[in-house]
């Protein structure tokens, strides 16, 4: 990818591109997506953006308006709530049982829906819990959305990082007849370890893709030209990508298993992640004196043990903390040893 970026620079690829991205990259994204879905996808369905975050932001602004409610599985990535707020829509948290790693089902959706519900955001594998939805679980959720006429925004940025086989994409679940209300967002930041290159994309109906590109034309215009060429190289050399991902997954699995063992031996409650690279750790029971134990523990770990974690309140889960194991193995294991030694007060 770095060599591809050098070649692009040498060739003078420093000008604007189409707002939606260079045609070869969009075609490569469409071809990859088509392998996961019976119905064909082409470049006109794809908008390349400055990371998956921008793709989600574009979708929220293009689809939702003041008064619209969007269901958000909770605990969930903090930016979902903020993006919807900026778009003047209302984020409605939906939470499944702890025993199911908080995954939602038809029952939770039916309880949360109102006549103002217009959409649903899904994230599998999940940040922060690492939960992965099975095909049957996704089929149940899609059925509810189809019946209600909701849009589904499926954030699949962690799809390549799964410890229980291959994570199911909604592209392979949603029927082609209902694909018109499905937006997939993905990118290179996680499974290709390219967060700084700022390349993400959305896949959706052509009319929506045009609206999202029009919106993007007034914010950032095209994603960085050089990064687009690097991304094309990454998506084109599938053998090299699979080999690199397999090596990365071996290391991530070692970190996950080692860190999980240390924390559980220390008596901490930890959700076992099936995907992504986070451990969700229980920080204690919320009380009137300590309504956000995750915040208190995160501050204590940073101030007294030089360990940085994310307080669960960022994900609407104040009794938890999120521990990343994306850092070097030695740092991860030392960090979780300190967390285990600190315990829960």
Question: What is the role of each PLM region?
Answer:
Residues 232, 246-260, 270-284, 319:
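Conserved glycine-rich beta-strand-loop-beta hairpin in the small C-terminal domain of fold type I
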Residues 92, 96-171:
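Active-site phosphate-binding strand-loop segment of PLP-dependent enzymes
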Residues 290-309, 313-345:
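PLP-dependent enzyme catalytic core of the Aspartate aminotransferase-like
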Residues 86-91:
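A short helix-loop-beta submotif of the ANL/AMP-binding
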Residues 62-84:
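Conserved PLP-anchoring active-site segment centered on the Schiff-base-forming lysine
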Residues 4, 175-250, 344:
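Conserved core segment of the aminotransferase class I/II
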Residues 1-51, 58, 108, 237, ...:
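N-terminal small-domain helix-loop-helix segment of the aminotransferase-like
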Residues 40-46, 67-69, 116, 179-182:
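Short acidic capping loops at alpha-helix termini that bridge into adjacent secondary structure
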């Amino acid at each position: 990818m770095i060599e591809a970026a050098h070649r692009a620079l040498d060739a003078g690829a420093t000008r604007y591109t189409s707002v939606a991205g260079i045609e070869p990259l969009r075609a490569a994204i469409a071809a990859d997506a088509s392998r996961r879905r019976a119905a064909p996808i082409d470049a006109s369905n794809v908008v390349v953006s400055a990371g998956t975050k921008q793709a989600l932001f574009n979708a929220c602004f293009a689809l939702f308006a003041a008064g619209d409610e969007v269901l958000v599985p909770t605990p969930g990535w903090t930016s979902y709530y903020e993006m919807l707020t900026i778009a003047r829509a209302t984020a409605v948290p939906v939470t499944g049982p702890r025993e199911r790693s908080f995954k939602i089902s038809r029952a939770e959706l039916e309880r949360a829906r109102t006549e103002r519900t217009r959409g649903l955001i899904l994230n599998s594998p999940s940040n922060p819990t690492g939960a992965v939805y099975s095909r049957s679980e996704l089929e149940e959720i899609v059925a509810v959305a189809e019946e209600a006429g909701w849009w589904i925004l499926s954030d699949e940025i962690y799809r390549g990082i799964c410890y229980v086989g291959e994570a199911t994409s909604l592209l392979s679940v949603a029927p082609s007849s209902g694909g018109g209300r499905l937006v997939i967002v993905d990118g290179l930041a996680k499974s290709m370890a390219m967060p700084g290159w700022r390349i993400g994309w959305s896949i959706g109906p052509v009319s929506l893709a045009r609206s999202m590109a029009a919106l993007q034309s007034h914010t950032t215009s095209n994603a960085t030209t050089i990064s687009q060429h690097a991304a094309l190289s990454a998506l084109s050399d599938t053998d090299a990508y699979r080999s690199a991902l397999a090596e990365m997954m071996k290391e991530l699995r070692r970190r996950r298993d080692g860190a999980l063992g240390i924390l559980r031996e220390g008596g901490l409650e930890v959700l076992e992640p099936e995907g992504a690279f986070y451990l969700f750790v229980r920080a204690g029971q919320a009380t009137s004196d300590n309504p956000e134990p995750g915040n208190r523990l995160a501050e204590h770990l940073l101030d007294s043990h030089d360990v940085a974690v994310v307080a669960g309140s960022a994900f609407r889960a104040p009794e938890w903390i999120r521990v990343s194991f994306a850092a070097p193995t030695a740092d991860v294991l030392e960090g979780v040893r300190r967390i285990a030694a600190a315990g829960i007060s």
